[in-house]
């Protein structure tokens, strides 16, 4: 299998919605990797970010972005794997993202994130990472 799926966490997805310093580099990095995935909790995370930023006009664009991402269902098996992940100080949502990304197996190109703690945990688990900037 080809490693062609880019796994996006909220810190990366928001850069596709709102222009930030890293947004152009992220878009360039994703261009040859059109298949994107994330845990289904991204739906809540991204819409909450938009609402917290006071930008309700971006909600339709956020929903459009989410429609282009394969959202991985959070079933009991995935949640159990997330609960058992090391390091023990891993935050709950980060552990869910890592378990979801790991579930992609050989198809995972990289976990795309700008969250240092999530990236460190992914590296410790042997998962490929990318932080285009």
Predicted regions and their residues:
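Short active-site oxyanion
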Residues: 3-4, 33-36, 67-70, 105-110
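Short, well-structured N-terminal submotif of metal-dependent ribonuclease cores
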Residues: 1-38, 51-61, 126-127, 133
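A generic structural signal for short hydrophobic patches within well-formed alpha-helices
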Residues: 13-14, 43, 118-119
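Phosphate- and divalent-cation-binding pockets in alpha/beta enzyme and binding domains
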Residues: 25, 45, 81, 120-121
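Residues within alpha-helical segments
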Residues: 11-14, 63, 83, 102, ...
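Active-site neighborhoods of divalent-metal-dependent phosphate/nucleic-acid chemistry enzymes
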Residues: 70-120, 127-128
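Active-site-proximal, substrate-binding regions of enzyme catalytic domains
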Residues: 40-77, 81-84
């Amino acid at each position: 299998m080809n490693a062609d799926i880019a796994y996006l966490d909220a810190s990366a997805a928001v850069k596709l919605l709102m222009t930030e310093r890293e947004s152009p580099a992220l878009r360039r990095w994703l261009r040859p990797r059109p298949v994107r995935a994330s845990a289904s909790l991204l739906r809540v995370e991204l819409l909450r970010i938009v609402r917290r930023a006071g930008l309700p006009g971006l909600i339709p664009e956020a929903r459009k972005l989410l429609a282009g991402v394969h959202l991985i269902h959070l079933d009991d098996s995935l949640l159990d794997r997330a609960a058992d992940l090391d390091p023990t100080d891993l935050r709950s949502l980060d552990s869910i993202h890592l378990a979801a990304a790991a579930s992609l197996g050989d198809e995972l190109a990289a976990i795309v994130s700008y969250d240092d703690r999530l990236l460190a945990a992914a590296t410790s688990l042997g998962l490929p990472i990318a932080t285009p900037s």
